[in-house]
Amino acid sequence: MSITVPTSRAVKGKPYRATLALLLAGLAVASVAASVADAAEPFTAEAMWKLKRLADPAISPDGRMAVVAVTTYDMDQNKGDADLWLVPTKSGKPRQLTSAVSGDSSPAWSPDGELIAFISKRNDDKEPQLYVIAVDGGEARRVTNVPTGVAAPKWFPDSRRLAFITQVWPELKTWPEMAARLRERADSKMTARVWDKAPFSYWDRFLDDRKTHVYSVGIEGGEPKAITLEAGHPLDAAEPDASSYDISPDGTEIAFVSDTDTTGTDPNFDVFVMPVDGGAARNLTADNPANDFAPLYSPDGRLLAFRKQVIKGFYADRARLMIYERRSQATRNLTEDWDRSADGLVWSPDSHSLFGAIDDAGTRRVYRFDVGGGTPRAITGDHSFGSLAAAGSGPVIIGLRQSFSEPPTLVSIIARTGAATKLSDFNDAALANLTQGKVESVTYKGANGEDVQMWVVYPPNFTPDRKWPLHLLLHGGPHNGMTDGYQWRWNAQVFANWGYVTAWHNFHGSSGFGQAWADSITKEWAELPYQDTIKAAEWFTAQPWIDANRMSAGGGSYGGYLATLLLGRPHPFKTLVAHAGVYDLYSQVATDDGATKGRYGEYWQDFERINRNSPHMNAANFNTPTLIIHGQLDMRVPVNNSLELFNTLQNRGVPSRLVYFPDENHWVLKPQNSVFWYQTNRQWLQQYVKPGPGEAAAAPAPAVSTQQ
């Protein structure tokens, strides 16, 4: 007989099975555990917001210390405050370095190990500015006073200068001129915005006519000097960050990413290099019509790594790890035959290899890539890792580890074995008093008879001798595969604590399962994920501990689209939740990225394909009670989608509720709004799918083991 029992961390195996004998024995154990469980608190949305959130860490040049921004949220104030903490990578207690009310972010360690640069908005700052602070403490000192604000600081090797990015008007030559234009636009009673070229928006904001460029400044302050401005190749206007540029180890050259498209409808990001002191910029990737991005110099300065896609206009195309040899100007592809996407890359201090945080079959694993070639090698197994940094001998690798049961936690990782040692305990005390359900990874047969991986989170008091309701969560993207990681917006532990078996399935199109899997839905958005969702429900129905009459489903973004799609097709769910979901694919394509060239042609060239994939075409079949949620500031999936869906359901007499947030975007990010979001979900689900254990489950037949 083969019995697999979920543990508090992710495991892979067969679904929860138990014989009658095991159940009887478990009752005795359960009575002992009950007293412990009674002392614990449920994992609620309010409890989740009490947890501290860690951002990307930076590591000291000798590898002995890490610095990380830690955000603590105040529910009454409805906001968070981020402070910098110093954490030893071997032994010792963390030490708080900053304590500003406004919040500090983006720490960067100086090459000499003496200073930490960071971004903050303090005192009379109108925009975020660059600050430095000594590692041994003291007062932080402002370095810039740029009216357009700064982001993504990086050090020059002499530890006397810093680079940063900001968005400027190239035709204005001085900072006072830029400050004057900002004031003029802010004070103007005329509020019209005008565009002659796409794109005009990004996620939750309108884009203006400024351009993103790299500047440098001395640590003592003074006038920042433009680096990329005169070359005429701006960085990404929509989402520039630290991966947009890098500085060579000798400080003489900069590598950066710029969109070479001049139409606004056919983006092509390329990697450029140019002298820091000025001169022409050279395009290293002009021969590739798809995107190249994330340049990263090796510590010895010989090599430049970057990532390359080959399918134009497909953001989920796997990124190849490319190595450019600066002396010979030759480029090599390290991962052409590897069916995963290179991501989250950092160099080993010896320049012989890189480490990456790779989306891999439902988990983010750390992989090692040898510069000499060979198959990339996974060095971690369970849990998900990201935000890597490396330094010192060994090397010392730090990063954030997380799972469905562990919020991002600072750890050190042994490169040879992948063993991780926890360095921070910011959330240990809070988590010790919270009940979290067991987590399991299962595989079932989905569309086309192909295996689909699925994460299942059980209620903390789950026993397989009773029938339980299901809440199936539908992830977004659609290519953002669900990994074993902590979710702040759709936290499965919160749903499980309400009394629902909660699951995420990595349907066709999900990242981390190979290029063919990701690309299988790019022309037809609907069919395969729909089939995978129905097959997931059928898999659960076959389990003796699931009540087939108490099943629900819901998701956001593409997950909201999939929920809306289910409305018009046969499905077994008693209620659905659609957050920021696409309802009318015509208006969605036209408003979101309609100006961008379509990979499979434009919507006016193939109405039948759009009709097959648009939920609104099946409105005559809508009968399922539905909770609809949307934020006014959402420009990724504009709010009209949810307004149209709600009105359609109301017209048809289908029980429905519209929850509208005037101050939220594609996500619900403010603490009080988030708690209300969870409360509303809970109330709605309880109305149609009663939580908690129900009638006794039929005893399962003994399972015949097929394990070796």
Residue ranges and their predicted role:
Residues 61-62, 111-112, 157-158, 249-250, ...:
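Residue-level detector of Asp-centered blade-edge/turn motifs that repeat once per structural unit
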Residues 88-92, 134-138, 218-222, 275-279, ...:
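Short loop/turn segments that connect beta-strands within beta-propeller blades
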Residues 491, 496-497, 504-708:
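Active-site-proximal cap/loop segments of hydrolase catalytic domains
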Residues 70-83, 98-104, 117-131, 139, ...:
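A flexible loop/linker signature enriched in serine peptidases of the S9 family
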Residues 463-468, 473-513:
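Short substrate-entry loop that stabilizes the transition state in hydrolases
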Residues 58, 163-165, 187-228, 243, ...:
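Non-catalytic accessory segments flanking enzyme active sites
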Residues 63-66, 113-117, 162-163, 254, ...:
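Hydrophobic beta-strand positions that form the internal "hydrophobic ladder"
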